[in-house]
Every structure is written in structure tokens, then in C-alpha cells.
Amino acid sequence: MAVSSTTLSSPTPPECLQQQEAPRPPATRGRLVVLTGPSGVGKGTLVSQLRQRHPELYFSVSVTTRPPRPGEQEGVNYYFRTREEFLNLIEADELLEWAQYAGNFYGTPREIVFQKLSQGQDVLLEIELAGARQVRQQCPDAIRIFLSPPSLEELERRIRERGQDSEASIQRRLQQARKELDAKDEFDYVIVNDNLEQALQELEALLYPPSPGKGQS
């Protein structure tokens, strides 16, 4: 089955950027930020709040074979594709990274990411652990952040509170979460999401540190 490449076509990617923490002039490359954490830890909510405060940050919309949840929109939350279409994207090398999670495939369209970076725009990827490891191989200068729950028990409570998963699915997610938590030391930064506002402030401090001398008389 042919897959439309209107939004997912992929040229040969340029080299990855050098990590920079200070504000950059428009002519320089943007930063690639990778956010990873267990399902239910609050990545989506945190990203939504961050984007409201920093609309200049480009959020890369992932491709998935997961069925849309109520309220989700094509091209806004995800690009929804069949399994066959997704495999075609892999074969065509149109994905920067991809991984299988809870029986579904997830991946990041390659072209738009490098396009935004080359234009000097920061790009945020909210992806799974396996995908984050792939990005590390291709873009070692990416800023890698792990969002952790305060405890596994709290994570289970949040997943159950969503009311979207069967018991079998909850157990699979918790099993995967244990593996992901064991890998958090692979990341540059770890933020514990015990309080959303505090986690957001920590994330902002990492990505948008105050300019030297700001606030001083």
C-alpha cells in the first residue's frame, strides 16, 4: 500500500546540532530536546503546559498505529496510520526513530525535525525509551530529559485514574515502566513529576535559563 508522503517525506538529513543552552541568534541551528518517561507519568500534560508558555518551541507530532482516543485529532495529537503504512515508512527511511510499545508502533517523521532545526527552531520530541536511544545514536548532542514519577505506586494510581486501559494493559505498562525507570541514568537530566507546576519550572529552567545578569541592578 502506498503511503502519502505529503507531510512525511524524507530527504537525507543534515548533521545534528551542537547543544547550546544560551539564547541563540536565528542563524544558528535549533536544539533537539528529547523527553521520555513511563506511560502515565504526565508527559503530555507537561508538554502542553510548556508549549503554552513557549509557543516558539516546535513539538514534533509522532506517527502511530494506535487507534485514536476520544478527542484526538489527525496531525495534532498523532499521525494515525495502519501497521502496513507504518512499515512502509520504516522501509523508506522516513522516520528518525521508531519503537513498538504496548502492541502499537510509534515513530518520529524525519524531514520536519531537521527542517525546523536548520531554521534555528528548537524541536521537542516526546518519545519512548527505545526511540530515545535511537535518537542518541544519530544525534548525540540532543538534550535528553527523563520524566519520572515519585513512585511506581503513584504511577499505577495515575494510570488507573485515566480509566482508558484494561487490567492486562495496566500490568504491561507497569512492567515496561520498571524497565524505563531502570534506564533513567542514561539521560542528561531527570525531573520527578510529583507536582506539575514544579516539574514545569524545572523543565523551563533547563531549556530557558535566565540570561547572565538578568534581574541584577
Curated annotation (Swiss-Prot):
The keyword Acetylation does not apply. InterPro entries: GK/Ca_channel_bsu, Guanylate_kin-like_dom, Guanylate_kinase, Guanylate_kinase_CS, P-loop_NTPase. Residues 30-208 form the Guanylate kinase-like domain. It holds the Pfam family Guanylate_kin. It is found in: Cytoplasm. Its main location: cytoplasm. It catalyses: GMP + ATP = GDP + ADP; dZMP + ATP = dZDP + ADP. Pathway: Purine metabolism. Its EC number is 2.7.4.8. Residues 1-10 have a biased composition (Low complexity). One of its GO terms (cellular component) is cytosol. Keywords: ATP-binding, Cytoplasm, Kinase, Nucleotide-binding, Transferase. Residues 1-30 are annotated as: Disordered. Belongs to the guanylate kinase family. This is Guanylate kinase.
